[in-house]
Amino acid sequence: MTVSYKIPESVLVVIHTANLDVLLIERADKPGFWQSVTGSKDVADELLLETAIREVGEETGIVVQNLSTPATSSPHQGALSSSVPLENLQDWQLSNVYDIYPVWRHRYAPGVTQNTEHVFGLLVPRDIPIVLAPREHLNFVWLPHREAADKYFSQSIAEAILQLPRYRKL
């Protein structure tokens, strides 16, 4: 039997509007804990951009795509209004290295104790349909970025949110 370990490299995607409202999603495993889209690479050679696109789709139903190319099927894809162009996804060239909680280290190869998280921003219209993955998230809310930063339990997410005015795509 082959053991498949989690890859200690992940993305954090700050989903926001042009007016700097930020999408917060409430964790199903910890009600009251709010976060942005996060997730690890599925395979070592998966590009971070691919990880970000996949995680956004899985967790919110938002399809990030090259709109000049025909859409591929997605479990959450409905009307084109759930789609945003690839150009709206921006790699902020920021990364955070943090210790993996001991309770989760069994998911990683022996000796792995840290994860590197890469930060992206995704500009979306305020009225874009959000379809949460019910096993992962309970609820969502849009808040002004400063108010959103205060609501997050993760310091790295809060710090990324506060950087939004600097990195947002105009």
Over which residues does each language-model region extend?
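Functional cleft and adjacent loop/helix regions within the main domain
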Residues: F33, V37, E136-H137, F153, ...
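Active-site-adjacent beta-strand/loop module that shapes the phosphate/pyrophosphate-binding cleft
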Residues: Q77-P129
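NUDIX/MutT-family hydrolases
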Residues: T113-L162
